[in-house]
Structure formats: structure tokens, C-alpha cells
Amino acid sequence: METKLNYKHLLGIGPLRSTGSKFLSFCSRNHGLLIFTTVLFFISACRSEIVPEPFLPSYAHEAYQYSLEQANLDRTALGRSWKEAGENALYKPEDITLPYQEEFYLDPAEVNAVGYRFFVLRGLRIEIEMTIHSADSLQLFSDLFRQSGDPELEFTQVASANRDSLRLEFEPRRDSYYILRLQPELLRGGRFRVLIREVPSIGFPVQGKNSRAILSFFGNPRDAGKREHHGVDIFAVRHTPVLAPSDAEVTRVGEGEIGGRYVWLRDQKRSINMYFAHLQTQEVTPGTRVVAGQIIGTVGNTGNARTTPPHLHFGIYSRGPIDPYHFIAETNRRPAGITGDSLFLGELVRSKQTIIVNNSPGSGNLPIDTIVQNSIMKITALTSNLYHILLPDGSSGYIAGNQIEMANNAIKEQILTDAVRIFDTPGISAVCVTDIKPGEKFAVLGKFKNFIYGRTFEGRTGWIPSL
């Protein structure tokens, strides 16, 4: 089941970018329209994704946002920032490649949300696990969206993590980009770890074999190019058991000139029909139910395969033939281990040398900036051997490890000859936090562009223009 985030048409409050959720107030004004909305919701919730019941899409995030509005917190800078952070996580996610593992820090004194965008092929099941390390109990809103080509919808919510299990999984029915959004309650934070991986959605159909036994693939030419191969051929010795890849119903058992002895199974959950051909024996009868792993026949070379070594022709059909490879082929890929120093997580650091900043942690990353030695930055996440950094101007990116150090110890001390104002950020919109009188010391901790970051004799930190 999936939930269309079309607030304009379903809930009457405009697209996701609109300001101020009116979901519950809208419903209270018109109970009749609420009933119509509910019916329309279930009609629109077509089975485009397979989501286990504990992970069905929920409106917990929107309900929490409504509670902020009821408390008039949406009129405060803090409440507005929470909503904007959730939207930014969808509209400006980090592009990643699966499998992926990251440890990140969300400061409870700040308002944050994170988003990850990744591409998923049909036939795979995506498994997402979250871990929370926080001194306080908190709710982490974990929602999964599919990017939509419809500008009115923009995103389609397909799954939500169960709060107790902090786990989420789903099976797409189309090749598409998906976005995972993670956002805690207001004034809650800590260290988090997220693991996103992909696995085949059904079992391998030949006992004791794996994808290395597939020697002929979907789309390969047949009959001198007159037709295409609508399945995969899995080679094994004669009489090797053929297994039901999932719970299913036996719909047909028979014999034909091309497929030889065959069996058809119907997986109602996934709306697919599975075809097993060239069988030596058939061990099931039409109308019966089978469970995943049950023997339904044995490998042979009947039909037009009599001149080839024994093998199973396995096909999947859903409104036509589809490539079964990703449904059954093991991924055998683990995310790279996190080797960065977790002591840096959530801390201000400075560069030990000139550093190239890349736009993403994946193999297709591109350089987007270069920062000079002693530049100040904040470490917000660790993944493999990379650090995700936030620069003082709000830009972000990824840098390689072993190029940073804590920005605690002074690089040098300066005695100021003139009065200087210290600002909270290095920019024209900065706010003055304190003043330094002539003759006072200023410990230089780092810099960023035309500003110096440091600490006063009283221990106040901030930015001053380059001297």
C-alpha cells in the first residue's frame, strides 16, 4: 500500500511546499468531506509497492506537525524551522549508492532532518535499519517516499518505520528513485546509525545453486534473433530439486513442445506469475498452495531443451514478461565499514591541509569546492572513510579522512590593537555576540574565507573579520 502525498487533492491543503498544515482543522470543518477523503485515499492507494504491514505508510510525521500547530509553535521560528527541515530533506537529499551505512549526529539544540536518495530496481527488497544513541528517549520519524513524475504529487509515501523496531522494508514494483527521510522530534537529538541494503525479494528456485548457475539471461536472442529469451536458464544436474521461490498457488501443470514439462505458480502478494520449464518431474498439482522452499519439481531438459544440458528455465510475468534476475540473484554486497573517527562527530574541526570537497559519497562524486588549511567546518556524519561536513556558509559535502583535527587548541594568539566585534557566523547577516577591547587577547582557532574563528579570554567563541 502506498500513500499519495497530494495534499491539494486529498486533504485540501495544497502541495508539500505549502506553509502550515491544515489537515485536522480542515477535517473538523467538514465531516462529510472527511469520509469522501478517506474513501478516495484507499482508492488511490494502489499496490505499486509491497510493504509489510508493520511498515505501512503512516501520518505520524504530519500528526506531530499538527500538534506543533495546536500549541502555536508553528508561529515560532523553531516550529517553522522543523517543518522546513523536513521539506528540505525531501527536496535536497544526499544521493547515495546502495548498500550504504552512515553514522550521523543531530544536535538537540538545532532543528535538523536528513534525507537519502537512492535508485532501486524492481525485484529487489530494500531493508533499512536505524539505531539511536541518545541520552533522552525520542521519536524518530522514518518515512520512505518514491519520487513522482507528477508535479502535483511530487512524492509518494510508500512506507514508514515502526517506532519500536526502527526497521523498514519494502519491495518496489518499478525501477525508480526513493528518498528516506529521518527527522526527530523538536529539541531531541543524538547519534544515529542508518543501514540501507538491497536483497532479492524471493528465493532462488534451484536447490543448492545461486546466480553463478545462471548461464542464459533475459533478452538473449533465440531462433537466430526471431525472438527474445523471456527468462533465465539455471543449469544443474538432472533431478536437482526445483523450489517454490515464495508462497504461491499452483495454477497450471502440463507439458508443451517448447517448455516441456512445466509448472505455473501465482504469487498473489507480488502480483506475479512464475514459470518453471524443462522439468524432469512435476511434484505439485493445480489448485494447491505451496510455501517458499517447497519442492515443486526437478531439473531436466524436456521440450526444446532435449539437446542441451539439464537446466531450469525460470520466467516471471506481470502484464508481460519481466526480467527475473534481480528477484532471485543474491547481492553479496555489504556496505563499507565506517573507519572515520567518531570522536569528530558533531564537533567543530579544522583542516590540516588544503582539502577537496566532493558532492556525494558515491563512486560518481564530483569536486564542488576546495578549502584551505585551517578552515573551520562541522562534522555531521561518517560513512566508510569519508566525513560529511557542514561549512560555516551552510554548504556541505564529503571529504576524505585523516585531513582534519579538533579546533580546540589555538593556532596562535593575537593581541588586538583596536576594538573588535565578534559575530556568531562569518557573514553579512551575522549577529554580534560580544566585543573585544583593545589590548585583549584573541585565540585564533581557524578561519573561513575572509573571517577568523577564535576564542576570547573569557571563553566566548565567534568570528571576526580577517585582521
Regions found by a protein language model. Give the residues of each.
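Zn2+-dependent peptidoglycan hydrolase active-site motif and core
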Residues: 245-283
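Short aromatic-glycine-enriched beta-strand elements
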Residues: 259-264, 384-388, 449-453
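SH3-family beta-barrel domains
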Residues: 57-59, 63-74, 78-81, 89-97, ...
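Non-catalytic extracellular/lumenal accessory regions of secreted precursors
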Residues: 47-114, 197-223, 228-230, 350-353
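Acidic, Ser/Thr/Pro-rich low-complexity intrinsically disordered segments
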Residues: 47-51, 62-63, 106-164, 176
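C-terminal motif of bacterial Sec signal peptides marking the signal peptidase cleavage site
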Residues: 42-45
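Surface-exposed, glycine-biased beta-strand/turn segments
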Residues: 173-261, 292, 301, 312, ...
